[in-house]
């Protein structure tokens, strides 16, 4: 029996040694990758490593007050033939200028001119940068703190029924909000806001929505205004009823426009708790997915977004530690 056991041990010992060496190699590789900041399985990480590497992604932000607000009212009823209703909410007296059929190329050239040549602080400045390459222009005076509904429509005299197939050379509607009083332009860093709005027509029936919003700063920069996404309660009701057939058609149109990835579940403003601990208030926004879902205590333990599982490249706090402590004192 002893001889048989020794022979068996001799035959299988190389496989045993190979398995041990391979296991040690995997464990060592995981630890080294963890030290270098690569994502490794949780079992090979410790809390100190995770906290240190994630904190390095913190992005410094500067708070800026935006004096402009623009939304679409009853977007389901908007079309090129019937027009669109816009709701404004501005902190100061402003002017709303609407450009129908604005050239896509000229618009982005105008934004670049704001950076290098002159500032787009008035409608006249934008029109000069556009070389008046648009079909129709409308302008309205907006009183501060008044949520006014502005009805805009492309005149039938232009003879335009659609803007052609995708990709298009003209945006259906570009809305510019500027400060009416010149003295107010010295108060705010943001001096104007450009909104690119899609309006359905006979050729392209994607529902009416704001495609892009650009904040124009007095210092010569412009930034794409992005929406932050927070977790929604399952009991929340959708903003509008939609059948499955309508949803599939809308999704196919979004894919053609390259916007299918931008669809997000409805957001409920009352949802403010951390999605992990369900205790602390949400204070951290993860980039590039823009999910606001973690509190100050939980943010240091995640390299991936807990909502969409996308890797976190950067993150920033919605408010500083002093402001958070002040809110806690007020609620207690």
From Swiss-Prot:
Q: Does the keyword Transmembrane apply?
A: no
> One GO molecular-function annotation for this sequence?
zinc ion binding
Per UniProt, what is the name of the gene that codes for the protein in this document?
Answer: Cgrrf1
Q: What induces it?
A: By p53.
Cellular component, GO, one term: nucleus
- The protein in question is named Cell growth regulator with RING finger domain protein 1
> What stretch or stretches form a coiled coil here?
none
Q: Where is the signal peptide?
A: none
Q: What Gene3D superfamilies does UniProt report for this protein, alphabetically?
A: Zinc/RING finger domain, C3HC4 (zinc finger) (3.30.40.10)
Identify the domain of life.
Answer: Eukaryota
Q: Where are the zinc fingers (RING-type)?
A: 274-309
Indicate where this protein resides in the cell.
Answer: Nucleus; Endoplasmic reticulum
Q: Which UniProt keywords apply?
A: Cell cycle, Endoplasmic reticulum, Growth arrest, Metal-binding, Nucleus, Zinc, Zinc-finger
Q: What does this protein do?
A: Able to inhibit growth in several cell lines.
Which tissues is this chain's protein expressed in? Highly expressed in testis, lower levels of expression is seen in skeletal muscle, liver, lung and brain.
Q: Name one Pfam family in it.
A: zf-C3HC4_3
Give an example GO biological process: regulation of cell cycle
